[in-house]
Amino acid sequence: MGLSFIPRRTLAAGAMVVAGVLGLAACGGGESTTASPSEGASSSAAAGGAKLVTPGKLTTCTNLPYEPFQFKEGGKVVGFDVDIVDLAAKKLGVTQEIVDIDFAVIKSGAAMAAGKCDVAAAGMTITEERKANIDFSVPYFDATQALLAKKGTGVTSLEDVKAKNLKLGAQASTTGLDHAKKNGFDPREFADSPKELLGLQSGQVDVIIQDLPVVLTWLKKPEVAEKFELVASLDTGEQYGVGLKKGADPVVLKAVNDAITEAKADGTYEQIYVKWFGKKPGELG
């Protein structure tokens, strides 16, 4: 299924206006994006009567990069989440368009409330706090947190990190950050996952907490695997969901839910999973 991509800088001015109206100026580290005023102001009906912010497009808010869930490769946005949402777009008879925006604006529900996108797929964990502002699809991914540290650090748990008085880093606005705080840490926060990894590589922190698939993807890179290692997997019982505007369009919600459910039943989900993670569901760790 084809898709198009709206980079952050292309529509930065419009995003700043929306952010100002919503009081979101302090939300995140990167520039946010939005549809043009004419697109955001009115919805258009797609197959089955779905109301979409842009004619012929299922517009997805995400935060790049978050490999292997969503990242740019050869000028295109690809990834596990992209393939999942493509299934829903196909059901609606449209193509997917991707908008790169700060994760804090996504998880607050403000991006969809402002008409920036129809759905959000950004490796986003379903939480009760987020449910207050976002409607979620059925779960599409079982998530686990992980700790990445310099080789020889000698830690295998958050307890070890605390006992050794090591500096912990986490990505801002994430459940990894929340989990660390619940365990008594005050982590150094980084705006996105690449900055978090750079913080570890540059010695700003000694250990970082991040979703396991992201850590495993980093470790495929020789420059990371040479000096750093996965020291712990933390079973936090998290599940990702596709986010929708509160009081979501029932046609869009049904398309997303049906796409996920049917893909799991007919083997498509497993094919996508193996494509991006190299293992079948339940084998990742």
Regions found by a protein language model. Give the residues of each.
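Sec-dependent bacterial lipoprotein signal peptides
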Residues: M1-A25
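Bacterial lipoprotein signal-peptidase II cleavage site
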Residues: L24-A41
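Extended ligand-binding regions for polar small-molecule ligands
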Residues: G28, V82-K91, T174, G241-K279
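Extracytoplasmic small-molecule ligand-binding "clamshell" domains
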Residues: G40, A45-A122
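Short loop->beta-strand "edge-of-pocket" segments that line small-molecule binding or catalytic clefts
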Residues: T59-T62, L158-S173
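Acidic, polar ligand-binding/catalytic clefts
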Residues: E97-D160
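Short helix-initiation/N-cap motifs at beta->coil->alpha
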Residues: I98-A110, V155-T156, A172-T174, R188-S202, ...
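Periplasmic-binding protein-like
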Residues: F141-A149, L212, L216, K220-D258, ...
